[in-house]
Amino acid sequence: PWIDEVAYLNNSIEQIPNDEFSYEGLFGKVIADFETAYNVLPEKQSDGGRVNKIAAAAYLAKCYLGLAWGDGYEATTGVNHINEEYMRKVVIYTDEVANSDYDYLEDFGDIFLPDYKNSKESVFAVQCSDYKDDNTSFGRANWSNMLNGCWGMWSCGWDFHKPSQNLVNAFKTKNGLPMFDDYNNEISYPINGEVNEQKWDPRLFHTVGMPTYPYKYEAEYTMTKNNSRTPNTYGYYTSLKEVPQRSKGETYNGSWQAFAMNDYVFRFTDVMLMRAEAFIELGELGKARTIINDIRQRAANSIDKHISYAKEQCEIALYPESYFQDKETARKCLRWERRLEMAMENGRYFDLRRWGIASTTLNAFFASEQNNVYDGQTYAQYYKDAHYEADKNEFFPIPYNQLYYIPGLYTQNRNY
C-alpha cells in the first residue's frame, strides 16, 4: 500500500488497501516526491554527503528505468514491453548527472576505501563516521556491513555476504573480453603467483577476497583458507568492497565493532550504466559503447596502484564496434558490464527482475552452483532444492498475519 504522511495524520493506515494503485501508479507517487526534491534542492551543497539536485535526478532516472521495462512480473516485463517514453526520461535525468561535477574516480579500488568517501564518484551515500573523527562517543558506524569481514580477520568478521563461484567465473576474459557463452563451463579461480592461460578482469581482485591474495591490498593480511568460517557450506570467497583495509582498524567504540565505510546509494558509474542501458533500448548503440568502454578503460587503469601482485593474471580490452551493431549483442555487453562493475553492491536481483530474466538466470545459477568444488572441498549444496517461479517470486507474498488481522483489506500477490 501507499502510506504517506496524510495516512498518519488521518490515522487511516489500517484502512488503506494494497491494490489502490497499480505498479505504475505507485511509481508515479514516488516520482512526484523525487520531482519535488529535484525542483527545490541546490545542485551543490557545502557539506559532503548532503543530498542535492543531482542525487534527485539519479533517483528519477532509476524510477523511470524500472518503469520502462514493464510491471515487474516476467510475463509482462522485458524487451517486448519497453516503454520508449520512459527510456527517454532516463536519458534526460542521467544527462543531469553526466554534466555535473561528478565523475569516475581514476582507480576502481579507491572507490571502496574510506579515504575517498564523498568523492566525485559518490552521487549519494548513507553517511558513516569514525568516533575518533566525528566528536561522538561511539561513532556513527555502518552496522549493515559489520558481519561481512572475513573470518579471523576482524573481531566482527563473521564471513557473511559471500561471492559465488558463478560470479568469479564471470570475470574470466579471453583476448580481454568477457567469455559470454562458456564462462561457466568449468570452475576456475586464480592463485597468487600462478600464471596460466586463463586471464581475469582486474575488477575481480578488487571485489572478491580469495585465499593466497592480500586482503584488501595488504600483504601483511594475506587471506588463507582458514579465513572462511564454514567452507564446506559457503566456500572460501569473501566480499571486499564494503569493508576497509585491516590496518585501518574497526571504527566503532563499543563492545561490538563496526566500520565507518559509507554505503553507496548511487555512484557515478551506476548512473552511467543506467544511461547506457537506455541508449541501447533507444537504438543509440554507439553512445552506449562509449560509456561502457570508458568504464572498462578505468578498470584497465586500476591494476598498478592496488593489485600489482595480480598484474600478470589480468587482461581487459575495450569493445570493438562489431559488438554494438545490434541491440541483442549490445544488451549482452551492457548487462555483463553491470554485473562486473556493480558486483556485491546489492542490485543484481533487481537488474534481473527489471530485464525479465530472473527465472532463467537464477534457476540456471542454482543448478550449476550446487556442483561447486574448491581445492577438493564441495560446498553450496543448499542450492539443490532452490527454485525461482516466474510470475510469482518477483514479489514477496503479503504476510498471513496481515491478511488475517484485517480480513478483506489486502489482496494477496499473484500466485501465492
Residue ranges with predicted function:
Residues A125, G152-S164:
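Active-site core of glycosidic bond-cleaving carbohydrate-active enzymes
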